[in-house]
Amino acid sequence: MKNKSDDYVIRVLNSPQAIDAVQWNKLLALQEPASELNPFMRHEYLAAMQASGSAVPNTGWTPHFIALYNGTELVGVCALYLKSHSYGEYVFDWAWANAYQQHGLAYYPKALVASPFTPAPGPRLLAKDAATRVQLVKALMAWCDSEKLSSLHVLFGSDADIAACAEAGLMLRHTVQFHWKNVVPTLVAARTALPPEGAVLARGGPSLQTAAPTPVAARTAQPPTQTQFKDFEDFLGSLNQEKRKKIRQERRKVSEAGVVFRAIRGADMSSADWDFFYRCYERTYIEHGNAPYLSRNFFELMATQMPENWLMFVAEREDRPIACSLIALSSGEQNGQKTAYGRYWGALERVDCLHFEACYYQPLQWCIAHGFDSFEGGAQGEHKMARALLPVKTTSAHWLAHPSFADAVERFLAREEEGIAGYMEALERRNPFKPTAS
């Protein structure tokens, strides 16, 4: 499908392979923060989702990528999927779907702009500038309207994405994640790190002028004068006594069980390493009665096309691998933020506190040793606060075609935002760090 919007040609494509990878990644590199290339929006990552059979029509993800061209130049693009369910999204709208069904209306298929199965904040609407990003949102909404879809959802977007969605009249919704920063936070810094409350936007109108998206700097960012931790002991020394003692106890349990760890960068991972990881990854899903979202072939593609973006921790006991965690790493590490993302984990044997060691303590220790600025722990999990991951808000944007349901969801989001504000305040009182002067 082709049409025109202002000076741009809009193409709707059923595969990322139909878009030049060099142009895509060049556009991704322009997004904020410019010094950090988000791995989950790389062309290779999204192409692997489809090529591996992980995010395809048979699994409920039908690709319809929206691309804006100025001549032959790609100036805007997003990964749009028609969804026949709400699995693998981590922003829960099952209640909305049920309400539609109860009133005899179809909620699915819906339009979703996201990186499949990936609840990591970052750019979703890639554009050469703010004006083009607004045009991209308009193209999205026009396409949804032409296809008579129930709704459009932009998940875990960047500040620039959210601003463009707000300008177009989409409603904003917040969720809470837990992220770690490689600096000693002051109580004042931790408080100001919380994004502004009451930022639910009306669908158009003057209220858009008073609501602000969550700033990137607000994601527990720290003053630039602060330095990184010297080592893991330095990090532990910043925690209050209770949390410091608990972490040491948990690490001791794993060590006394005879478990040791190997950290392996992507380029050094063998096929056997990836096979073992997948056994662990698959086991986690099976234990919860589910099939894994991602196929073994997806990780094979990651191993060959994006090895620099992966880090594996293998737990061994008596020279046998027993558990594994896989961490994603941002690209563009030379001039700015370097971020690690906790992604997958699994174990073939049970050891007390092994999950905490594999998924938090080993990655944090590695981040400190390698000068990484932050570690994002993924969706949900307030137990992460005891491991020094602090709460931050993430933002998604939503448009519903049905006026009455849109009004109802808007009221729901306003109530939900009040609850999140109270939740954030309660979490702040559980700050695991020592009180320090600002």
Language-model regions, residue ranges each:
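N-acyltransferase acceptor-side catalytic subdomain
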Residues: M1-R203, L208-S438
